[in-house]
């Protein structure tokens, strides 16, 4: 299974990039296959509408490291860029990502609405596999092209579904984080070119002062859970931004730290 879990859990975003193709794992320390049954969050409200007008153009660079038995192995660099862009003639945002220095280079380009960050169009690559998706209010239409050929699909999409790592981070930064905050979410998974939504939960685990580089920062530690999979993100309390994240994988702990 060629895994594109970036955001949503590779490159430290649980949601959005799971399987394209057949049973072959990524070689860069990606998330394990999602085979266990996923448990829906109990009766908590979804995270609701975020104010996309609060987003600003920005660029972030994260160093990726795999930690196993106290040994750290660099996995390359993940770059995220947010810019103003039009999708179908409608003003919006482009959340573009690239991962370099790893065994398999990957890219994501996600166009979202300016008002609430709902997805409009998504283009992604992992090595020679390509994904293209267009979204309506409650549906997705797209195609996957790989060495195995081309497959198209159409599927229902829950409102507020999360896709890429960059989208997950931007949404979490715009949430009203506080002690005890919990909200339900949906992660969109592509398995053998068939989209399916996974129930997930976003929760503030604790407040913590953490060091990023040479600077100590006051952060919320936010967990994103879908069944047996968990990602933690450190979000600064002032001028919120994701400065660190971690995820347990089959190969060790995958760390992502803002440079």
Task: Give the residues covered by each predicted segment.
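Positively charged n-region of N-terminal signal peptides that target proteins for export
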Residues: 1-6
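Bacterial N-terminal signal peptides
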Residues: 7-17
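Boundary at the C-terminal end of the N-terminal hydrophobic targeting segment
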Residues: 18-23
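Acidic, serine/threonine-rich low-complexity disordered tracts
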Residues: 25-139, 144-146, 180-259
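Surface-exposed beta-loop interaction hotspot
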Residues: 147-181
């Amino acid at each position: 299974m060629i895994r594109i879990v970036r955001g949503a859990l590779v490159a430290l975003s649980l949601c959005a990039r799971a399987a394209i193709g057949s049973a072959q794992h990524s070689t860069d320390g990606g998330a394990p296959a999602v085979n266990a049954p996923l448990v829906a969050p109990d009766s908590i409200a979804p995270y609701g509408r975020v104010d996309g007008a609060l987003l600003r153009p920005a660029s972030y660079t994260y160093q990726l490291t795999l930690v196993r038995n106290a040994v750290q192995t660099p996995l390359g660099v993940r770059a995220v860029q947010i810019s103003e862009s039009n999708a179908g003639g409608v003003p919006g945002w482009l959340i573009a990502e690239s991962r370099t220095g790893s065994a398999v280079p990957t890219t994501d380009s996600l166009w979202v609405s300016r008002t609430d960050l709902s997805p409009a169009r998504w283009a992604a690559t992992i090595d020679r596999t390509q994904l293209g998706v267009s979204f309506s209010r409650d549906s997705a239409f797209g195609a996957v092209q790989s060495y195995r050929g081309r497959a198209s699909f159409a599927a229902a999409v829950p409102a507020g579904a999360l896709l890429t790592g960059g989208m997950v981070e931007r949404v979490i930064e715009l949430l009203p984080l506080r002690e005890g905050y919990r909200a339900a979410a949906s992660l969109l998974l592509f398995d053998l070119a068939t989209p399916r939504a996974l129930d997930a939960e976003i929760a503030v685990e604790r407040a913590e002062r953490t060091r990023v580089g040479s600077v100590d920062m006051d952060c919320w530690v936010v967990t994103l859970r879908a069944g047996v999979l968990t990602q933690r993100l450190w979000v600064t309390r002032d001028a919120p931004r994701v400065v660190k994240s971690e995820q347990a994988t089959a190969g060790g702990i995958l760390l992502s730290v803002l440079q």
